[in-house]
Amino acid sequence: MAVVDSMVSQGIKPGILTYNAVLKGLCRNGKWDKAREVFRAMNECGVAPDVRSFNMLIGGFCRVKEPDEAMKFYKEMRRRGVTPDIVSFSCLIGLFARRGKMDRTAAYLREMREFGLMPDGVIYTMVIGGYCRAGSMLEALRVRDEMVGRGCLPDVVTYNTLLNGLCKERRLSDAEELLTEMRERGVPPDLCTFTTLIHGYCREGNIEKALQLFETMLHERLMPDIVTYNTLIDGMCRQGDLGKANELWDDMHSREIFPNHITYSILIDSHCEKGQVDDAFGFLDEMINKGIVPNIMTYNSIIKGYCRSGNVLKGQQFLQKMRDAKVLPDLITYNTLIHGYVKEEKMHETFNLLNMMENEKVQPDTVTYNMIINGFSVHGNMQEADWVYKKMGARGIEPDRYTYMSMINGHVAAGNSKESFQLHDEMLQKGFAPDDKF
């Protein structure tokens, strides 16, 4: 902007090239207010913005995910009779495809064709990615067929996008066919291709196939990265095979690929699931010593591990460690502890936790209250269950079917027929069906 001001002060009228250079710099540095100011100055000085001027603004606002601003400049471009080019459409199509707004994406694709412009491989891939995100694999594959039909051959990014979509829909046989097609067309799979397929098979619990792909990948001289290892380690842990997960951990280190917070979180959670809290603590200490900051999910896993191993008190004491690390407990933290105390029949502790939640402005949910209500109801402590039920209503939290059935069964067992019928009627009014036995 200073360059433009200096030229104007010397009586030199900046041209379109100067203005475009200034716009480019401002957009690259995210100075959007200044960019708008320069755009206005161009008009005031009688310099008509061209397609490049508009593209810089449209592209810039697309990058910072401001669709309204991007569309505003596109409409201004059309109003002034400036013909959009493939860059203009690429920006807008990419923006809406990334957001899964496929009606808008298709509209800009049609408009592009009306100007006699044909999509290139990048645009086709963005559209395919949009349909995959929206869960419309039929449309994604249709666009792929159209792309090939127009002589625009998919590259590795296009194939990886389709593979990811198919794996998300658990269509692994179709994904395998696509991998074969990819090879037949002379497009070599890359690290992303294999990691996507490995993730798909791990989600299905087919660890054997995931490991086969891992071996194929190594045979093809593709070096795995931390994402590949995290995917496999997570797959092993989900199958309960911590031994194999530890082997992968060792293999990873032997290749000088080092764990990140995701790796540690997976292993901490898995050891806690098995009640191996000491092992989980070993990973937590190592993680902290390496300067990797645990997040709320990591801490919640440790608390869950204590609760599962019947040591809720230690889990609650661990809250202080969280706070010392500037990590505040959330709803999952408190629900885990409440569930643990209900299992141990220490119901008075659940009240303490409710008070702590209130003090820390953590809003309990239906699950929180259901656990406490059920804990009191199964032991016939209906006075306390009623108090919690009323507290739930006072906080604006709606009971669900489980809430009503816990309360009704508790009152029936206590011989309180009046209360149980009142709750039964209220339950029906809310649209919940009672148990057949009631």
Q: What role is predicted for each listed range?
A:
Residues 15-20, 24, 35, 50-55, ...:
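Pentatricopeptide repeat
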